[in-house]
Amino acid sequence: MSTKPPTHILSIHGGMTFKTQKDYLNFLKNCQIKLNKPKKWQDEYLTNELGPKFEIIRPTMPLKENAKYADWKIYFENYLPLLNQKFILIGNSLGGIFLAKYLSENRLPKKAVSVYLVCPPFDGSLSDEDLVGGFKLKKDLSLIEQNAKNVYLMFSQDDDVVPVAHAEKYRQKLKTAKIIIYKSKNGHFKVSKFPEIVKMIKGDLV
């Protein structure tokens, strides 16, 4: 008896963009290096909680600390032909607006089961970061909802990077997407566990 292939999850991490090379070099000069990195919900936790019915693919996107949309688009498209018939897309932070932009401007070869945009910025009105590098969204985002059976956007009221007001901006552009606002996800979803998304992903296949 043949076994069903796993549902692929293509998970796009966050990143940063800078207006100038000088700003980027200044960031590199002053960034704090941590040898012991905190555990993130999208890493081993997600793999362990979802189990063998899912296979998580985590591309290392080009130059994540000085990201350019055009670079990410090329690299992302290399993965699309490799995905199984059933697949889910997750974008975290900059990865979220990357998916929002890509899916609003391009039709996928095959429809995703679900798309999860976790704390995605909508525009450049951020607390202390620039949003440049070609990630600006166009006015019409309707194609996002045509590219997936389910679209979820997740925000936190205590997010200190992407203000929760960005949830309403997306709400005005999307008709059927489910927008979820949590009271607290330790700021910019800096949590080691995320049981809500695990339950939702498992529910996508029911």
Region locations from a protein language model:
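Short, surface-exposed "cap/lid" segments of acyl-processing enzymes
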Residues: 2-53
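Conserved hydrolase catalytic core segment
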Residues: 101-114, 123
